[in-house]
Amino acid sequence: ITKQLSQEIISTLKDPKAIAYYVNREFHFMGKQIKFSGLQNDNVIRLFNKNYCAYNDNLVHEVLKANGKTATLKNKLPHYTYTTFDNYTAKMHRYSALKAKMLYNKGIKPKGYHFFFRPWYRFINQYFFKLGILDGKRGFILAYTSAFSVFKRYVNLWLLYRNIK
């Protein structure tokens, strides 16, 4: 957390105008800030009154639901979630398994387009439309591993339906 964000949080808590506050995250990957790839607009609620907010039941990427007014803090939160490539891919593997379980619990069955179209679309969307290409090699790595994670999600879902480990 930066000094500026810390000061803003302290100031906000002295006279809160909302029950929850979004913080824009500054995404870093493999030692460099990612400015595109669809990750530049990442914001999450990180400051909230627990009496008016609750997380949903998602197994991964839980969402905090605020029952009241929200606002956004001005300062950004540096986000260093993936310190190494291996750390990033390990997290993608865990998330793909959890997302597959969520789909399985909803009764969604994998179809051919899940294996072919969805990963391809994820890569094209993240690398070209969300300008990951402007993040250089890191943008390519993020788009490629993200697309593979989508593919792996549906392989995991297919395995769940067949009771294969």
Model-predicted segments: where are they?
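Catalytic-site signature of metal-activated, phosphate-bearing donor transferases
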Residues: T2-I164
